[in-house]
Amino acid sequence: MTVRPRPAAAAIIIAAVFGAAAAAAGGGMVGVDGTQFVVEGGRTIYFSGFNAYWLMMMASDPARRAAVVAAFAQASSRGLNLARTWAFSDGGDQPLQSSPGVYDEAMFQGLDFVIAEARRHGIYLLLCLTNNFDDFGGKRQYVRWAADAGHNLTAGDDFFTSSVVKSYYKNHVKAVLTRVNTVTGVAYKDDPTIFAWELMNEPRCDADPTGGMVQAWVEEMAPYVKRVDGGRHLVTAGLEGFYGDGEHESKELNPWGIYYGTNYVATHRAAGVDFATIHLYPDVWLWGSTADEQAAFFRNWTRSHVHDTAAFLGKPLLVTEYGKFLWKGGGANKTQRNYFLDVVLDAIYASASRGGPLVGGAFWQLLLDDDVVAGMDDLRDGYEIILAEDSRAASIIGEHSEQLASLNGQDAEALRRRRRRPASSHRKTRLGSGGDSDALRLPRTLLIRFISLSRSISSFIQDNFVLF
């Protein structure tokens, strides 16, 4: 059964209160003007953000909602104004959608609470609608549902071509976008707290390395989301930035020169796609490489995407995920991680301050100390940033937020005409050795190689041999 709650009269009154608060805090719906994001009156807005995929899951249990409140409060205190999170959980033991069109009301109310809290703290939301990977169901779960219904589907990438699976996805889009928030009384499609819809987290396609299957899927789904939404919110595809084999595709810059089944330029040109995205994980994508090699990759990767976005897309660009693996004995130390943050955030500010297309980003991922709400330690993945535990990282992020906030409110038309000028940057954290001895370097490199190789092998086997 698809749950479609109707707001009571009290909720309608609450909606007016929340609506006024959100308008004051966030400036209303976000639009685009060339390579800039703008709010009402055509004034620019820049995004200093974070990822917290777990928000809906935590909020679905009233006893753990304190984690959501604390996360938004900590983020807001550091000037963060964008949160990227999941608006899906397909199947599994904590589903939002337990089977096609069947929704768990407690989980949906968790998402209601997340949106209401984001409003209260003046933070926009980038809501992702499904996953390329198996975490929280994703495309493979949709294919399983169709196969269980008697359709002859055998691989996860059938998600992109099966008419049945595509109908399931469209139904989910409609269920989410037309949902009326039980806290605020506002339909999601009408809520200015929601910055944009993301079609999928990190779409990839082994079945068609040229990117044609993903391209066709995005060309169908982006306009569909726009129609259901009424064109009020922005839409993006969710790409990591990998190049394909099409025109203006700098495929030689892909990690190891490999195709991932997407086309950065062509897909972001699709009708209904309002802005471009890239991700940045040089230590995973280039496992076993040196810090200098990763730094060179970062510079080329960022420079190329900023250029291509300006030259061939004319749209804004966000780094919607960036992170540095930080696990004792297996990843970078904090000094190296904080240096990485400095470099990424300086690149964002350099572009934004000169009127370029790279106008924001979101680090992966924000967590809280387990003392705040039990269970947080279970979400650690080596990339987490706990602001209360890492004063230097918190300072870097907070300073960057202040820098971007100083650019907010400019006239987008005037910004396009601005002459390019040098931009100030953060104070750099010295990379140094940070205590990373030669004795630890080899085990760390081997672990990162093992993790990356294991993920690749697992993904290949699941896609080609063990769907069910």
From Swiss-Prot:
Tissue: Expressed in seeds.
Enzymatic class: hydrolase
Catalytic activity: Random hydrolysis of (1->4)-beta-D-mannosidic linkages in mannans, galactomannans and glucomannans
Single GO molecular function: mannan endo-1,4-beta-mannosidase activity
Highest taxon of source: Eukaryota
Record bears the keyword Protein transport: no
EC numbers, comma separated: 3.2.1.78
Pfam families cross-referenced by the UniProt entry: Cellulase
Main localisation: secreted
Alphabetical list of SUPFAM superfamilies matching this protein: (Trans)glycosidases
An annotated GO cellular component: extracellular region
Residue numbers spanned by region Disordered: 415-436
Intracellular or extracellular location(s): Secreted
Annotated GO biological process: polysaccharide catabolic process
Positions glycosylated per UniProt: N152, N300, N333
Binding annotation for substrate: W86, N201, Y281, W364, D371
Keywords: Glycoprotein, Glycosidase, Hydrolase, Secreted, Signal
Record field: compositional bias (Basic residues): 416-430
InterPro entries per UniProt: Glyco_hydro_5, Glycoside_hydrolase_SF, MAN-like
Catalytic residue positions: E202, E321
Residues in the signal sequence: 1-23
Family: Belongs to the glycosyl hydrolase 5 (cellulase A) family.
Name listed for the protein in its UniProt record: Mannan endo-1,4-beta-mannosidase 3
Species this protein is from: Oryza sativa subsp. japonica (Rice)
